Amino acid sequence: MKDHFVKTENHQRMTAAVRFMEERGSASACLCLLHGEPGVGKTRNISHWGAANGAVLIKGHVGMNLDGLIWTISQQLGIKHRSNRTAEMAEQINVLKAQRAPIVYDEAQAGLAMRWQRTEAAGIEYLRTLGESAHTFVLLVCHNSEVQRFSDSAHIRTRIAHRGEMFNACESDTMSFVNELCEVGIGDGVGQLVHKQTGGKFRLVENAITSLERIAKVKGLSRLELADIGNVTLVVDHEQGLVPKITPKSNGTKGGAR
């Protein structure tokens, strides 16, 4: 599969959110929540945009604490990590101002779990202070299932100036992925088949493209037509095979699967 970035409707949604943040009025409302279901291409889009625009890119993970977050920011800004957090933050703010650099925090729910003394969601609070003081903005990227958690604190909720949502690719975007990323030529109808089997989930589209390339290699073809694929299942969406959640109803009766 080719190493190439394909601009889609999700890219347009993301850049629209960025424009809103750049043109916002209040410097204190420096947070933007960018969310979507797993597999829609959030990381793909923000990584491409962030690298092209000099953003500080942070990837949250299980076990990441506040000190790890601060260290990651300093490392990307070329600042020496130090024990005096106040001095380190001041230097971070100065560099962010000078570089006019935005901050992108992927898997931002990790920042909600951080605690410093009596401060909850310390990671998000730290980024909020940086964004406000440096007159820049912070993109907080998360799954749809995590969005509500950012409303638990009024201090954070009132600093979120904008929310943008990403979705599974439409048919035309799926066709663009297939045509631009596949290492072999693609005939009419193949892109539509990929969309039908994947539902436009970017991760599944990538798997489907790999399957197409494998079929072409086995058959010795430089171009794949719909007839070459036959009834082959290009991808398996394992999410569909998971046991459904059972939720209790409020009246005490058994809940249904969802």
Cite the ranges covered by each PLM segment.
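C-terminal alpha-helical "lid" subdomain
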Residues: K2-R13, G39-H48, N53, S172, ...
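Pre-Walker A adenine-sensing motif
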Residues: E9-S26
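Walker A/P-loop nucleotide-binding motif
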Residues: S26-I46
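Sensor-1/coupling segment of RecA-like P-loop NTPase cores
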Residues: C32-P38, Y126-S153
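Short regulatory helix/loop adjacent to the ATP-binding pocket of P-loop NTPases
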Residues: W49, E146-A161
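Short glycine-rich substrate-engagement loop in P-loop NTPases that contacts/grips substrate
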Residues: G60-A98, R118
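Conserved AAA+ ATPase "SRH/arginine-finger" region at the nucleotide-binding site
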Residues: G60-V62, R149-F150, A161-D173
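Conserved P-loop NTPase "ATPase switch" module shared by AAA+ and STAND
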Residues: V95-E120, C142
